[in-house]
Amino acid sequence: MPRTLIRVVFTLLLSLITGPAVAAPATLPTSQSAATKPASIDNAKTIQKKVASLGRRAIALLEKNKLAEAEPVLLEAIALDPLHTTNLYNYACLLALKGQQDDAVLYLQKAAEAGWTDFVHLNRDPDLKGLRDLPAFKKFLDQKPLYQKKSAERVIDSLKKQFGDDYLYELDAERKLIFATNTDKTTLSELKQWLTAQANSQWAQLFDHRLDHYVSVVVPSSEDYREIVKMPGVGGFYSDAAKLLICQRMGQTMTHEFTHALHAADMAAVGQEHPIWIAEGLASLFEAAQFKGDKLVPQDNFRLNMIQRSNRMRKLYPLAHLVEMKQPEFVKNATIAYGQAGSLMLYLYETNLLRSFYDTYKKTYDQDATGKLALETVTKQSLPEIDKAWNAWMMKRSPVPFSTGADGAVIGARLGDGNDGIRVEELVPGGPAEKAGMRDGDVVVGVADAQVRDYQSFVPLLIQFKPGDQVTLKIRRDGQYIDLPITLGKRSELPTTTRRR
């Protein structure tokens, strides 16, 4: 596909695989899906805009219970795009409210056949209350796995059209995951193993409800990622509306974004929308986590250094302000806000209060959605007291190292990030890596028994060793995996020519 088209087409893909989202305060889903098989991108965009406008108008009328006025608007939208999942679903709701139960079930079936799969929303939707005892409705619910599988297969087909034959594609029905990766089969297998283990651990530790829908996990090539995500510094994102996770590379960003996916499923099951400080706090908490047995154990990450420095400059936010932050302010001040939220979650985790806080928060959500009440309840402290205790705890933490230090262990190579490991860009002449047989272009994917997919994870692993230690690095070279023993050198004894060694 021409590079100039991929970003535009990918926007259509996002729309295509988007399922209905819960509208607030109405009970109707509001997201839009793509027009059917557009003859051209311009034509598709024109149809999308018209269908979206009609859909919004219909929802506004339905919110006011103006069913008679909403019906022709929805029918016009459906005529333009007979496979628009949200409009089909909303029309089913309208018919149910009118008492046309058989027709309502029929349109639910049409929506599901077109790709609508948000059965969590359906089971809570009061508009469908009159259908729940119908045999036809119960039969429809029994077909949920089939509808979801068919929808997932359509997503796979769409991804293949966007990214072509150089990617690997896989549908994991057991775990409800869809993969499109610019990696080899070994890396895809290890990614699946990591995400499966992460999900199992986070379900055991925190989230009560599992995925009830398929999530697409995309690891693009560097070139494709730059076309998809134009904003610098964004390593990945998760769109719950599209049930789509895209990461520039595996590693800490992938763990962060997949936590969002699992958290979103837990929120959806209870009909809640948690504030950004909780969502980003939980995702940041697990970024640098490593497994101890089957348990994913959080630990400090690079954000700690930033908030410690900000605290010395008196730039941290009072906790009372942090919990009230809306998304625009939080994102605008991401360096501090993400760091504070993640560190507060780690404080709760290490004081054995995280699960208690999260459960209490969900129970008291209707009383206080900010989290203030839950924090004060589980800690038995006021918010200012929590702030003071957390701050003292945080400032005593050891900063996260960005290098092994002047006399620390090194492999003797300049390193850069790839999408699935650490790329060897240049060897230090006569250094440990060169002596061990490493080559420019090798990709480091493991240190000793641990996976390593990004530089942020590499240094904390390497710092556990000292110069002179022999360590086995797992590398990929020309599609082959090699266990490479290497005797680590001392940084101060190497030529000063590289940034990352």
What are these regions (language model features)?
Residues 229-238, 245, 269-395:
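Acidic/His/Gly-enriched intrinsically disordered linker/tail segments
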Residues 391-429, 434, 464, 485-501:
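PDZ/PDZ-like peptide-tail recognition elements
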Residues 433-456:
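Conserved PDZ fold ligand-binding element
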Residues 159, 165-275, 286, 290, ...:
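Juxtacatalytic substrate-recognition/specificity segment
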